[in-house]
Structure formats: C-alpha cells, structure tokens
Amino acid sequence: DQFLVEVKEEFAQSFEVKDKYLSGWLKHHNETKGKWIRARLALATGGLLGLSYQTVTKWAIVCELIHSASLLHDDICDQDTMRRGKTAVWKEFGVPAAICSGDYLIAESFRKLTEIEQGWHQNILLKLLSNSVKAIVFGQSLDVSYEHLTINKGQYRDIAIEKTSPLISMPMMGMFRCKELSDLECDALEEISKEFGYAYQCLNDMENLYGKEQEAYTDLTKGHPNIIVINVLNEQSEDINSQIKKHPSKLIKLIEKKHYLNWITEIRNTLNEAEKIMHRLPIIIRPILESLKNEMLMRIKII
C-alpha cells in the first residue's frame, strides 16, 4: 500500500504542466478516480519477483499513464459523454483538448521510462510499451471499423482481445521480461490476458446496457459493438433485423433477462478457461490473477 501511495503521488506530478489550457484539461481528467488496477498488478508482480523498487514503481506509473491516455481517446471514438460520473474531457472542453491530453500522457509515459536507472530494464520496457500501444491502437481501429449491427461473435472477440488484453498483460509482462522468465511463462500470461480481456469487455457491455456510471444503451444508440446486442440480433428473423437496422432503438425491447444470464455464464466459463492456464505461471504469481478474476466475478454479482 505504501508503494501505491508513492506511485499515486508521482503519477499526479505527471499531470502538472505549465501550459494553463493543458493543465486544466489534465486536472479535469485526473479527477475521475480509477481503481489503479494496472499499478497494483505491476507492483504486486514486480515485488513478488524481487525486482528493484525503482524499476517496479516507474513501470507502475507508466502503465497508469497509458491507461489514462487510452480512456481519453476511447471516449472520443465512442462518443461517451461521461467518464466515472464526470463529464468526459472531449465533451467538456472539445475533441482537440482530449486528443492533446491523451497525446501528452503517451509522451509522458515514454519519458518516465528514461528515469529507470537499470539500462537493460529500460530497453526491455521500451519495446514492450511501444508494442502494447500499437496493439491498443489496432484494437481501436477494428472497433470503429465494424458495423455494429452486422458484426459477428468472432469479430467481436478479436476486437475485445486487441483493445483490452494489452492493458491487462502489460503491467505484469513488463515485470516478467525484466526478471527474464521463460517464453512459456510469458506465453501463458498472454493467453490468460486474452481470456480476461474478452471477459472484461463483455462485462463492460453488460454494464453499458443498464447504465452503470454512464448513460444506458449508448452502445446501441451510438453504434458501438456490444455482445448482448450481437446475440439478440442472431435470434431474430431477417425481416426484424432489417427493421432494426432502420430503427436501432427497437432492439431495446428485445433484450431480456435471459440474455444477461446467458452472458454471465459465458463470462464465468471464460474466466474458468483462463484459470486452467495458471498452472503454467510461477506459483507466487497465481494469486494476483486469481484476485483479478475474483474482482470480475464480484462485478457479475452486481449485475
């Protein structure tokens, strides 16, 4: 907990800039407090693997900076007007403000890596950071390119994995690579992260439909892929689907409790599949991923 406090303090310093406009945008964005999941993953993994305090804390900050930047850009792409109960930056200050804020945080994350004293750790983490950012961009490009009323489950899964899994695997993978764990162990973490990323995105979709900390049904009204919507459409006749394409709001009446229950089962099954891979990880690391799994199961209970 003490390390997390220090990470939060140093993270906040990255939001302190001299430009009064950028400073205001970043301040507004940083007021939407998150759960610090990525920092916790990096700190727990690095600590258990015995890596240096400096490498671990700097990497935890980097992961949170990238996540924060991704939220700014995601809100623009998805046209989400609220972020954790507050007005999104693009809605409050305009799209250019949100783009500039996100770009700044990405640049700051790369700068933060230069503060790591062990040069070979710098090189390892620089490569991973670059590849992770690219993967997130690839996922977002898929997300905005598919037509939300014609996308299939396989395409949805590809989007979910590309968009979400890098931000789950990156905090831990950085520590794995710095500790020089085997490719088999790194591959196992990658596979688990993909399953977790898919489950995480499905959960987000379900929460969108009932409006948790956001306006309900925005995936439908703004044309974003949503796993519940995909499965409801698969049950309908061509005639009804044709009507829905003309009037998407009609789909709301077709969403029933069974659709939520079916996907709660799907999410649980996905998490169980991920758990089957955990034996390939170092035993001291497994509780970290068990904790992440349990957190998603708690969100299911709320639904």
List where the protein language model places each region.
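Short amphipathic alpha-helical boundary/capping segments
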Residues: 11, 29, 276-280
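Short, amphipathic C-terminal "tail helix"
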Residues: 283-303
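N-terminal amphipathic/basic leader segments beginning at the initiator methionine
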Residues: 1-12
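Mg2+-dependent prenyl diphosphate-binding active-site environment of isoprenoid biosynthetic enzymes
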Residues: 12-238
